[in-house]
Amino acid sequence: MGINFDVSRPKARSSINMTTKFHTIGLIGKPHHPGTNQTLKRLHHWLTVQGYEVLVEERVASELGTNIVAVDLLEIGARCDLAIVVGGDGNMLGAARVLARFDVGVIGVNRGNLGFLTDLPPDAFEEALAKVLDGEFDTEHRFLLEAEVYRHGMLKASNTAVNEAVLHPGKIAHMIEFEVYIDNQFMYSQRADGMIVSTPTGSTAYALSAGGAILTPNLQALILVPMFPHTLSCRPIVVDACSTIKMVVSPENGENLEVSCDGHVHLAVLPGDEIIVRRSSEQLRLIHPKGHNYFHVLRSKLGWGSKLF
């Protein structure tokens, strides 16, 4: 599925330690956001002074002033060793769906709310980022989902998701009917507001709000979470990450249905369509500061209790 680019990387400047893992760095952020722009300007200046080649996503480049090398996300993925995303998890998800097809590390500076995927603080990123650039970091691979919509056996639409693919009606509080198959084995029929198919990464997002379990990031699994099911005994279920999930929409449904990928990309669904959700071949390569602790992140973001003794 990946797009191949034959783009040679420019040589690193002599002021950079040649043992470093990173030479060309991409900056990505939320457009027209004052806090994000401020952090991006600081990052650009800080990295440029140290001799790194810095590429800036074109959507935010015009807000950073002159002498900026503006490129699109695809070129950042093709040319950069590291991409720094400034914003919230939503900005990280949008960038990740593109960057996952390239061998580029991704780290985040949190300018959002919870920030499960954005490790660095916006007001004091320099110390932690300097250590990362010196090679002191942990790498974590997060797999993506691929969602496909078939109509009369023909592929009509597809996209990828980092967090989840959600089958739902276009109308609020509108129940739909569908069947669910796991690896072509019938599991159940469902009358509900929809179905969430989530990765471990997405298990702390929409799936958690709908009553799903939290899956640790290294778990090779998917979780299916029904949204307000009409059958109260229908609970979330965890399946192997290599499973193929098929949802068949009843012909009796209305026409205003869709599959949402991370809440950003929407695929139109008609009655009788089949939705296939499976693990994608693409992976997001997340970079964390050395000593990153997932359970510390959960405690701080979800307000869990600290140690008693």
Curated annotation (Swiss-Prot):
Major enzyme class: transferase
Entry EC number(s): 2.7.1.23
Binding site for NAD(+): 89-90, 163-164, 174, 191, 193, 204-209
Record bears the keyword RNA-binding: no
UniProt-recorded Gene Ontology molecular function terms: ATP binding; metal ion binding; NAD binding; NAD+ kinase activity
Residue numbers annotated as active site: 89 (proton acceptor)
Subcellular location field: Cytoplasm
Homology family: Belongs to the NAD kinase family.
Record-given protein name: NAD kinase
Taxonomic source organism: Shewanella sp. (strain MR-7)
Gene that encodes the chain: nadK
